């Protein structure tokens, strides 16, 4: 240790002592002197030890401790969990968010992105932290895999306060097993809460954390709610809401304010608004839609078109920083589940006064555009108005009119809209926007809330017509704000990172495909690549691969453009009922029109981060619910046979997506056939050593449902037949009929199963019909040697 630090006169050596004496009657060591001493030490020092070295008396100790805490608050020092102090500048400290993995390790993701990337946290570092916590991390070298390791020095903020999970007793101790597998440590429950609520083993409960985990001590929680049995109707949504911490109850202040909102447009609301009541604006939405954000109208004006997009004027009723706004900002988005919606706004606004319902007056913000015959927006203007929707139309209804040429009261306007859509669509293709044709599914429920069937949802031109109208208005909103130099949240979507681009090119090369553009591909290059996918069996999977190479779209207060849509500037203007960024864009546009400036209650940057996070959170919750429902649906299908295609390959097996219902499951590598099967990442396939049989992405297969486990949300299949192989293809077996065909649900004998498993050896197996149409020879069984490995 430095001799100066050992000196008994350390306090007297403080170069700022005279200043401190002028400020305080009983001066303490100055902040500068404390920092200098800590920097000389180079290692964290206990507060008690530092106090002794600085001759802090017993009466001064509490004030000295307060000074250190104030310095920590100001970022000058760090006080870690063990009560030791160190100079912040001496440590290369990084504030991070913990992203835990179900297997016990995790990552510390810097809050401010770094070129070096994330830190890996091994199990020892993860013992005292939980998924989502904000922590201070110090770099701790490079691990064997070349990744940066981190050491958690301090927990700045805990993310988890309530945890949803299953109740169990373990050797007399009440345990909460979190539903979120990233919370991989069991939580001990207080006995009093258990005695009060009396949950049954396996029931879903909510616990409030009373004591957070430490290195050698588990977290402790008390039960605050018993939700019920795991398989109860609607339980999947209750779990997702709590697992993802979705705000689902409006505050009392919000509910009280919402009641004061009128249910009709008043005369005083019309001041300064254009009257569009006679303009035949119509809404076009899905059959089940209840809130209507947007209405459209188009007419031919000379060689050009006039396009009017009227959007619900939510900003008139939800004022900055009022109680409704506070709840809306916290939620940031409506969350859509099958059979349930968690709205951003109270229902009397979202489905009432703000919704553009037919035949009633509603306030709106209008984007009034002139679009040339070439698809360019020649001019536009924004203004507040009052409107009256002339019809509530549906996508299927409009598409039927367009495709069948059926006469209807709105035929002239719909025909004009469709002609304009074709022009805008042509412009979109010329621009190089990436066109993704994804297939969505809809779950049909019975009266008991159980899935009756899953049906594909086909997007028709009526969907695309409205989409193009909304895109046009959103582009105008971004342009308007940029031209008037008003800060707002833009919707930014960047192209691929160098790492993701390299991965994509490698994968495409294995499939004989190419992406142009070199190190900086443009949207047009991506659009050209998408054209190469058309007609391929694996087209849908290639689209997913292409999507994953791009970065996530986010909300930011600076404009970076939208790569996927090929726009230089883009903002969200058209859905203020269900998206908070759209509401802020409305406020910013109104501010410009009124020659004012709109500033939110938190920084634009922080608001962008928050709304982007809430969007991802809602998506994650929706996926959880959908996966749970699909797994539940497949429980009754165990033993049945379905057809599908290989959607993924890994070292433990192949993933298969079933036709029509788009449910994914795993065929374990040990169930692929009587051979040694190896994962070949360089060709994105699994291949048999002896047979040469190969399973490629996009290959057609038939599978039997073997397991559907709600606890882990996994569905397992057993391979029945399929086509792939380097030597020849095996057609789908006559016995491998999809569910609904003859023999549905019948179990095969052991001998039949054995024969089925042999089906991938040298193209032989399941009494299969070869390419010639002749029955294949009886296969020669070869014993399986199962490979070790986790699925």
Kindly give the residue locations of the regions a language model identified.
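Charged, low-complexity terminal tails
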Residues: 1-191, 674, 681-684
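Conserved, carboxylate-rich catalytic/transport cores that coordinate ions
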Residues: 158, 162-791
């Amino acid at each position: 240790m430095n001799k100066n630090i050992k000196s008994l006169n350390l306090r007297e050596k403080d170069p700022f002592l005279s200043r401190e004496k002028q400020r305080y009657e009983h001066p303490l060591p100055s902040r500068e002197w404390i920092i200098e001493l800590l920097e000389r030490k180079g290692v964290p020092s206990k507060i008690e030890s530092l106090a002794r070295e600085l001759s802090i008396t017993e009466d001064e100790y509490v004030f000295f401790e307060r000074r250190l805490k104030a310095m920590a608050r100001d970022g000058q020092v760090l006080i870690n969990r063990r009560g030791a102090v160190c100079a912040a500048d001496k440590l290369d400290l990084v504030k991070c968010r913990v992203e835990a993995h179900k297997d016990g390790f995790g990552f510390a993701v810097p809050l401010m992105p770094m070129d070096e990337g994330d830190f890996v946290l091994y199990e020892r570092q993860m013992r005292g932290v939980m998924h989502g916590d904000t922590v201070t991390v110090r770099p701790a070298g490079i691990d064997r895999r070349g990744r940066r390791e981190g050491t958690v020095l301090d927990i700045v903020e805990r993310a988890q306060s309530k945890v949803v999970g299953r109740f169990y007793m373990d050797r007399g101790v009440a345990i909460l097993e979190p539903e979120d597998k990233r919370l991989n440590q069991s939580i001990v429950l207080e006995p009093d809460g258990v005695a009060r609520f009396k949950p049954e083993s396996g029931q879903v409960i909510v616990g409030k954390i009373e004591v957070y985990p430490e290195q050698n001590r588990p977290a402790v929680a008390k039960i605050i709610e018993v939700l019920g049995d795991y398989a109860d109707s609607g339980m999947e949504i209750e779990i997702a809401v709590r697992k993802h911490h979705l705000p689902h109850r409006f505050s009392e202040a919000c509910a009280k304010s919402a009641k004061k909102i009128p249910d009709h447009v008043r005369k005083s609301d019309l001041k300064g608004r254009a009257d569009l009541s006679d303009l035949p604006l119509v809404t076009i939405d899905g059959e089940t839609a209840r809130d209507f954000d947007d209405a459209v109208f188009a007419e031919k004006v000379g060689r050009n078109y006039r396009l009017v997009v009227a959007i619900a004027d939510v900003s008139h009723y939800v004022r900055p920083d009022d109680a409704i706004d506070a709840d809306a900002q916290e939620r940031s988005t409506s969350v859509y589940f099958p059979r349930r919606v968690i709205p951003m706004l109270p229902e009397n606004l979202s489905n009432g006064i703000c919704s553009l319902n037919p035949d009633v007056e509603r306030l709106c913000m209008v984007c009034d555009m002139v679009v040339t015959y070439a698809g360019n927006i020649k001019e536009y203007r924004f203004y507040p108005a009052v409107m009256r929707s002339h019809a509530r139309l549906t996508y299927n209804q409009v598409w039927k009119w367009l495709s069948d040429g059926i006469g209807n009261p709105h035929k002239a306007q719909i025909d004009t809209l469709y002609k304009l859509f074709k022009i805008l669509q042509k412009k979109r293709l010329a621009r190089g926007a990436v066109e993704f044709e994804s297939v969505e599914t809809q779950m049909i429920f019975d009266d008991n809330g159980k899935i009756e069937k899953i049906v594909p949802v086909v997007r028709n031109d009526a969907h695309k017509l409205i989409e193009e109208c909304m895109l046009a208005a959103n582009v105008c909103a971004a342009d308007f704000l940029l031209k008037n130099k008003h800060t707002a949240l833009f919707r930014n979507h960047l192209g691929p990172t160098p790492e993701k681009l390299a991965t994509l090119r490698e994968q495409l090369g294995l499939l004989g495909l190419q992406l142009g553009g070199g190190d900086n591909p443009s949207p047009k290059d991506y659009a050209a690549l998408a054209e190469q996918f058309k007609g391929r069996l694996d087209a849908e999977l290639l689209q997913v691969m292409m999507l994953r190479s791009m970065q996530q779209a986010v909300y930011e207060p600076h404009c970076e453009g939208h790569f996927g849509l090929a726009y230089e500037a883009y903002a969200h203007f058209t859905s203020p009922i269900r998206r908070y960024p759209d509401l802020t864009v409305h406020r910013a546009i109104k501010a410009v029109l009124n020659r004012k400036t709109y500033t939110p209650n938190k920084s634009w940057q922080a608001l962008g981060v928050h709304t982007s996070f809430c969007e991802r959170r809602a998506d994650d919750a929706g996926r959880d619910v959908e996966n749970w429902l699909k797994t539940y649906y497949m429980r009754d299908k165990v033993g049945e046979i379905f057809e599908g295609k290989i959607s993924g390959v890994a070292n433990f097996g192949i993933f298969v997506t079933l036709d029509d219902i788009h449910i994914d499951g795993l065929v374990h590598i040990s169930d692929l056939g009587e051979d040694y099967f190896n994962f070949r990442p360089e060709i994105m396939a699994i291949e048999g050593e002896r047979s040469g049989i190969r399973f490629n992405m996009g290959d057609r297969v038939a599978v039997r449902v073997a397991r559907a486990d709600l606890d882990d949300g996994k569905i397992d299949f057993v391979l029945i037949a399929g086509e792939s192989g380097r030597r020849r293809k095996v057609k789908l077996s006559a016995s491998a009929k999809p569910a609904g065909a003859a023999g549905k649900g019948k179990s095969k004998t052991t001998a039949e199963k054995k024969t089925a498993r042999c089906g991938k050896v040298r193209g032989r197996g399941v009494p299969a019909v070869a390419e010639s149409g002749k029955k294949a020879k009886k296969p020669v069984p070869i014993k399986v040697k199962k490979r070790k490995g986790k699925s």
